[in-house]
Amino acid sequence: MKMPSIIQIQFVALKRLLVETKEQMCFAVKSIFQRVFAWVMSLSLFSWFYVNLQNILIKALRVGPVPEHVSFIMDGNRRYAKSRRLPVKKGHEAGGLTLLTLLYICKRLGVKCVSAYAFSIENFNRPKEEVDTLMNLFTVKLDEFAKRAKDYKDPLYGSKIRIVGDQSLLSPEMRKKIKKVEEITQDGDDFTLFICFPYTSRNDMLHTIRDSVEDHLENKSPRINIRKFTNKMYMGFHSNKCELLIRTSGHRRLSDYMLWQVHENATIEFSDTLWPNFSFFAMYLMILKWSFFSTIQKYNEKNHSLFEKIHESVPSIFKKKKTAMSLYNFPNPPISVSVTGDE
């Protein structure tokens, strides 16, 4: 076996050194930029301008249609922490703050329901330390949301929280905490937050099928239809449709989330931004895009039906004769076709 020469070893070492130096420089530049941005944001004049700009943009968007149900796949917390050389816990905490900020915005825009993919059933396969960290953070955020939902001075006042998923996988203490928070916020009717924890779409549909079959056998109920099936899902009525699903961190997949809810004309947006960095303007542009195309679609549907009514009311003598032949007027295709290779 041929041993690598000293020059090759030095070249590999130099290459690694250059890569590490590049990463350190990128990290330093990002840190400086973040500090400068944080300093600018702390200026009272800039903060005043930013808040008023948000208010103007929100009022402008409320003029048109807004989605009733917006959902988030909150991906990128761990990479966010790793990029800043922070513990994984800090990344998840930053993600919690991002969700809270966007909930404020959605409620002000007039969105009735927000759902968030907080914990997949598959996440139980992660290291125990990280799972315990997520459970503890989830408990803290539950208490925080319950307090905000009952504080009339808080923007989330009058909100309702529902934890959906396979709660049999959670500890008795966690199930007790969830039940308490849901009871505290059950009177909220302005805004609903669904936290999917722990959740997968396959589990959601499996649970619904079991409940539907048991109900049919016990109560001799009529045939199971789509409406009844949908209402038995974890999110109940809100399982009917999700208008806008947003996933961050650059991955182009749904990760077994909201497969039933997005099957009917939903808009799915993918962002390369990590979840803790997902900002007001990023979400605003996505909702603005949804509102724009939703308005065009409704306009086209309305004018198309109006054109059909006008066309039907016009006497046949004034209607333009069709010169193109319809496909339905062609004879039936042959039963079989054989092709030879002869010249």
Swiss-Prot record:
Q: Per its UniProt entry, what is the enzyme's top EC class, as one word?
A: transferase
An annotated GO BP: protein glycosylation
Q: Which pathway does it operate in?
A: Protein modification; protein glycosylation
Gene Ontology cellular component?
dehydrodolichyl diphosphate synthase complex; endoplasmic reticulum; lipid droplet; membrane
Q: Where in the cell is it found?
A: Lipid droplet
- Provide this UniProt record's keywords sorted from A to Z: Lipid droplet, Magnesium, Transferase
| Needed cofactors | Mg(2+)
What catalytic reaction does the record list?
A: n isopentenyl diphosphate + (2E,6E)-farnesyl diphosphate = a di-trans,poly-cis-polyprenyl diphosphate + n diphosphate
Q: What is its EC number?
A: 2.5.1.87
Q: Name one Pfam family in it.
A: Prenyltransf
Molecular function (GO) terms for this protein are: ditrans,polycis-polyprenyl diphosphate synthase [(2E,6E)-farnesyl diphosphate specific] activity; prenyltransferase activity
Subunit-structure text: Forms an active dehydrodolichyl diphosphate synthase complex with NUS1.
NCBIfam families given in the database record: uppS (TIGR00055)
The record's listing under PANTHER family reads: DEHYDRODOLICHYL DIPHOSPHATE SYNTHASE COMPLEX SUBUNIT SRT1, DEHYDRODOLICHYL DIPHOSPHATE SYNTHASE FAMILY MEMBER
The family line of this record is: Belongs to the UPP synthase family.
Q: What is this protein called?
A: Dehydrodolichyl diphosphate synthase complex subunit SRT1
Organism of this sequence = Saccharomyces cerevisiae (strain ATCC 204508 / S288c)
Per the record, the gene is SRT1
